[in-house]
From Swiss-Prot:
Cofactor remark: P700 is a chlorophyll a/chlorophyll a' dimer, A0 is one or more chlorophyll a, A1 is one or both phylloquinones and FX is a shared 4Fe-4S iron-sulfur center.
GO molecular function, one term: electron transfer activity
Annotated organism of origin: Cucumis sativus (Cucumber)
Record field: catalytic activity: reduced [plastocyanin] + hnu + oxidized [2Fe-2S]-[ferredoxin] = oxidized [plastocyanin] + reduced [2Fe-2S]-[ferredoxin]
Transmembrane intervals: 70-93, 156-179, 195-219, 291-309, 346-369, 385-411, 433-455, 531-549, 589-610, 664-686, 724-744
Binding site residues for [4Fe-4S] cluster: 573, 582
Protein name (database record): Photosystem I P700 chlorophyll a apoprotein A1
Binding site for chlorophyll a': 675
Main localization of the protein described in the UniProt heading: plastid
Keyword tags: 4Fe-4S, Chlorophyll, Chloroplast, Chromophore, Electron transport, Iron, Iron-sulfur, Magnesium, Membrane, Metal-binding, Oxidoreductase, Photosynthesis, Photosystem I, Plastid, Thylakoid, Transmembrane, Transmembrane helix, Transport
Length: 750
């Protein structure tokens, strides 16, 4: 830490009225680009309009102006998020069975969408229990609302209106901070101040206020709900907040107020700030008192973290100093120069944030089922499957986005003349070693992981089960994973003396939590089948990384095209007369990386779906006998490719294929339609541009003959545009197919 003299007097950090508000400008499509604003000559115009509308780098090279546009766009994004949230809460208030579900969450399914009978589609309104007919939802909103203490639909209406007000406020803020008071570049680059405000404000005070809400509103209301009190009889949130005696009846230590806090007698608060671990046996969710404790602790950490960085007072950390001091014996200049990169290239900044947020999203996916946070979430199998799948897909897309923006940074913002012997330069200089080694790892993993399956298929086909890799023949137990499970299962009262239960039931220990005769969670056994599929995960993830990293490291130059940086982020080929140089741009690596990301995530969600149905989810009889949905067939069936096709894809597709005539029939139609969208993508991916240009010219000839030719000249999509349309339909078609397959299955059997 360095102590310096304080900064001079307050600096002016905004420009007043920098850009006039002009509806004429906004009404002219492509007003941000001189070329596009001229209007269309050919049909390529509409594609360029979409490609460049948000590419602020192409509108101007002024970093301050780009920063302001990004900042303003963020407010627009927040406005859309508030609008979406408002819609969710409004549906909960207007079209849902939330109050009925709250009264009996184990027998009534959540529904917040009722289909209007226009052409007979009211068949989609299935009976979700309690006499309510509607579409069963799997978003987890009901469970979240119960956890936050919402007991009636009026509260949902109020929240929906509040979200609309905030949406309007965000729209106004986006306009105000671009047209009326736009921050100067220095404000965007003041990282210490930004860290302090984001850490202490957003994360610190945000967590603290949520902890406060949980203690004063959620805990007492959930205590009543768990005890079976009718939601209409429970006092309203403001009564708990304003009347301490009400809370003191539930938690006697409340009567003492803040005295134990200031006298350091904190154990008095252990009634409602607990450290139990495990799940609440009534709801199958984490103990809400544990969650409140967690948010309070997190708030303290972030409030402290938000006071660590040096701003107007000459005390605290400076990010530049930290980065420049960060060098090891083998890393040359280390992180010197990174500060300049991250404060002048928003692509570099965004790349790191996307990589971290993507990884975090995938971690969230795993925690949502292993430590289900909300009441009655664990026994709502459709919602569990949806939340896992959703967070896995989102994480995958964010990580590919990280590679995309890293490559854009390399092409547009990287200055090789100022970088020497820092970490980035060193990585670039031995990129051949990195990529060739990574390639070797991919080949090794691919042949060995797939080879184990092929061996098993062959032995199975030849009728030699004793020679297969399985839990009953040649065992390949995941010993390291089992060791980690055991250390966590044994930790309470030994290495974690304060904890009474393990962090998650999945670690082991023999406990089972069932709610309303359904399994919420139990110890998840890992065996040979998991060992095999985990190596497929390793393989697909490493190939995705190989493609994306190669795209980044070779985005400026390669032996094939030494001057690649001059060609930009996306280009089809290195000009005429240079055969074999197509599809080498950084954009093309992102394009290919998306397909492998899709492979990776597909295997993960298939593994999860089958494993949970086979070994976790199911019913519990009065005698305590567990019957799993697929009867534990994962361990023996998933060890062959044939088993995956026969016992997972085909066997579990029966619900979606046979859904016609039932309330699940929309999933049958989506399954069909999404397959079509996916197949449509192949038309773009498997044919060349010239084919379409020739076809178009024939069609234009026919139009000319009939004198109906348009003024805008039709053109085939460029190579890059065609690939973009192809990958979009491939991914959307594939994801929607999986969605329909999963939901029809799990709603029917779960």
């Amino acid at each position: 830490m360095i102590i310096r003299s304080p900064e001079p007097e307050v600096k002016i950090l905004v420009d007043r009225d920098p850009i006039k508000t002009s509806f004429e400008d906004w009404a002219r499509p492509g007003h941000f680009s001189r070329t596009i604003a001229k209007g269309p000559d050919t049909t390529t115009w509409i594609w360029n309009l979409h490609a460049d509308a948000h590419d602020f780098d192409s509108h101007t090279s002024d970093l301050e102006e780009i920063s302001r546009k990004v900042f303003s766009a963020h407010f627009g994004q927040l406005s859309i998020i508030f609008l979406w949230l408002s819609g969710m809460y409004f549906h909960g208030a207007r079209f849902s069975n939330y109050e009925a579900w709250l009264g009996d969450p184990t027998h009534i399914g959540p529904s917040a969408q009722v289909v209007w009978p226009i052409v007979g589609q009211e068949i989609l309104n299935g009976d979700v229990g309690g006499g309510f007919r509607g579409i069963q939802i799997t978003s987890g909103f009901f469970q979240m609302w119960r956890a936050s203490g919402i007991t009636n639909e009026l509260q949902l209406y109020c929240t929906a209106i509040g979200a609309l007000v905030f949406a309007a406020l965000m729209l106004f803020a986006g306009w105000f901070h671009y047209h009326k008071a736009a921050p100067k570049l220095a404000w965007f680059q003041d990282v210490e101040s930004m860290l302090n405000h984001h850490l202490a404000g957003l994360l610190g005070l945000g967590s603290l206020s949520w902890a406060g809400h949980q203690v004063h509103v959620s805990l007492p209301i959930n205590q009543f709900l768990n005890a079976g009190v009718d939601p209409k009889e429970i006092p309203l949130p403001h009564e708990f907040i304003l009347n301490r005696d009400l809370l003191a009846q539930l938690y006697p230590s409340f009567a003492e107020g803040a005295t134990p806090f200031f006298t350091l007698n904190w154990s008095k608060y252990a009634e409602f700030l607990t450290f139990r671990g495990g799940l609440d046996p009534v709801t199958g969710g984490l103990w809400l008192t544990d969650i409140a404790h967690h948010h309070l602790a997190i708030a303290i950490l972030f409030l402290i973290a938000g006071h660590m960085y040096r701003t107007n007072w000459g005390i605290g950390h400076g990010i530049k100093d930290i980065l420049e001091a960060h060098k090891g014996p083998f890393t040359g200049q280390g992180h010197k120069g990174l500060y300049e990169i991250l404060t002048t290239s928003w692509h570099a900044q965004l790349s790191i944030n996307l990589a971290m947020l993507g990884s975090l999203t995938i971690i969230v996916a795993h925690h949502m089922y292993a430590m289900p946070p909300y009441p009655y979430l664990a026994t709502d199998y459709g919602t569990q499957l949806s939340l896992f799948t959703h967070h896995m897909w989102i994480g995958g897309f964010l990580i590919v986005g990280a590679a995309a923006h890293a490559a854009i940074f390399m092409v547009r913002d990287y200055d090789p003349t100022t970088r020497y012997n820092d970490l980035l330069d060193r990585v670039l200089r031995h990129r051949d070693a990195i990529i060739s080694h990574l390639n070797w790892v991919c080949i090794f993993l691919g042949f060995h992981s797939f080879g184990l399956y092929i061996h098993n298929d062959t032995m199975s086909a030849l009728g030699r089960p004793q020679d297969m890799f399985s839990d009953t023949a040649i065992q390949l137990q995941p010993v390291f994973a089992q060791w980690i499970q055991n250390t966590h299962a044994l930790a309470p009262r030994i290495t974690a003396p304060g904890a009474t239960t393990g962090t998650s039931l999945t670690w082991g220990g023999g406990d089972l939590v069932a709610v309303g005769g359904k399994v919420a969670l139990l110890p998840i056994p890992l065996g040979t089948a998991d060992f095999l599929v985990h190596h497929i995960h390793a393989f697909t993830i490493h190939v995705t990384v190989l493609i994306l990293l190669k795209g980044v490291l070779f985005s400026r130059s390669s032996r094939l095209i030494p001057d690649k940086a001059n060609l930009g982020f996306r280009f089809p080929c290195d000009g005429p007369g240079r055969g074999g140089t197509c599809q080498v741009s950084a954009w093309d690596h992102v394009f290919l990386g998306l397909f492998w990301m899709y492979n990776s995530i597909s295997v993960v969600i298939f593994h999860f779906s089958w494993k949970m149905q086979s070994d976790v989810w199911g019913s519990v009889s009065d005698q305590g006998v567990v019957t799993h949905i697929t009867g534990g067939n994962f361990a023996q069936s998933s060890i062959t490719i044939n088993g995956w096709l026969r016992d997972f894809l085909w066997a579990q597709a029966s619900q979606v294929i046979q859904s016609y005539g039932s309330s699940l029939s929309a999933y049958g139609l989506f399954f069909l339609g999404a397959h079509f969208v996916w197949a449509f993508s192949l038309m773009f991916l498997f044919s060349g541009r010239g084919y379409w240009q020739e076809l178009i010219e024939s069609i234009v000839w026919a139009h000319n003959k009939l004198k109906v030719a348009p003024a805008t000249q039709p053109r085939a999509l460029s190579i890059v545009q065609g690939r973009a349309v192809g990958v979009t339909h491939y991914l959307l078609g594939g994801i929607a197919t999986t969605w329909a397959f999963f939901l029809a299955r799990i709603i029917a059997v779960g």
